[in-house]
Amino acid sequence: SWNRLVSLELNVDNAWASYESDVMMKFQTLPDLHEIVKGFAKHEIAFFEQLFIARQAASGALVAKNVGDFNKAQSALAQLTPRFNALSEAYPEVKADSHFLDLSRRLVRIEERLADRREFYNSEVTIWNKAIQMIPTFIIAAVKGSQQRELIDVPDYYHQDYKIQF
């Protein structure tokens, strides 16, 4: 029914908003980490530029609710994360900095929440996509102009071992 489709669509939008909120928290934490590390690793400026270009692309796609572009930007950002962690390992004074430790822990908690929210969003999208393809709701979905939604990808990086190269 029409009401069921409206309800399902609102569930997808709500799940996206929850995910978006945590991604924005992550994006707000990254500049703080950047400021701490850049004081110790000034010769890594090119890396930090890559990190923030990827962050801006992901942020723009997130605000535009463009899941496809967000998936691409998030993948680029995820590939830079191990290098960021390696920088903290390479500079013991960074690793010992209490602000860095606090922010790193915060980032880990945010990443854990993001994984949960991504799973919830993808579940809601799957329910939505199934509903708009089934009889008789596909007729109502067509009248309503409903379209399939994209899932949030888990970047390939998370499924493989990563070797850090400088």
Where are these regions (language model features)?
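A helix-centric hydrophobic-segment signal that preferentially recognizes long
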Residues: 1-166
